[in-house]
């Protein structure tokens, strides 16, 4: 999980999801997991 100021999709399988007021990226590739901090 990378915590970044700006999250974006890295590949086509990345999905932007809003959970508990935070924007997250979930993907089949674990390296692409991100959260907005």
Swiss-Prot record:
Gene Ontology annotations for the cellular component aspect, listed alphabetically: chloroplast; plastid; ribonucleoprotein complex; ribosome
Source taxon at top rank: Eukaryota
Keyword Heme: no
InterPro entries to which the protein is assigned, alphabetical: Ribosomal_bL36, Ribosomal_bL36_sp
Subcellular location: Plastid, Chloroplast
Pfam families from the UniProt entry: Ribosomal_L36
Biological processes, Gene Ontology terms: translation
PROSITE patterns: RIBOSOMAL_L36
GO molecular function: structural constituent of ribosome
Predominant location: plastid
Keyword Hydrolase: no
Record keywords, A-Z: Chloroplast, Plastid, Ribonucleoprotein, Ribosomal protein
Family to which the UniProt record says this protein belongs: Belongs to the bacterial ribosomal protein bL36 family.
Protein name in the entry: Large ribosomal subunit protein bL36c
Gene giving rise to this polypeptide: rpl36
């Amino acid at each position: 999980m990378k915590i970044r100021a700006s999250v974006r999709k890295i590949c086509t399988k990345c999905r932007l999801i809003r959970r508990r007021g935070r924007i997250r990226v979930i993907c089949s590739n674990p390296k692409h997991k991100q959260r907005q901090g």
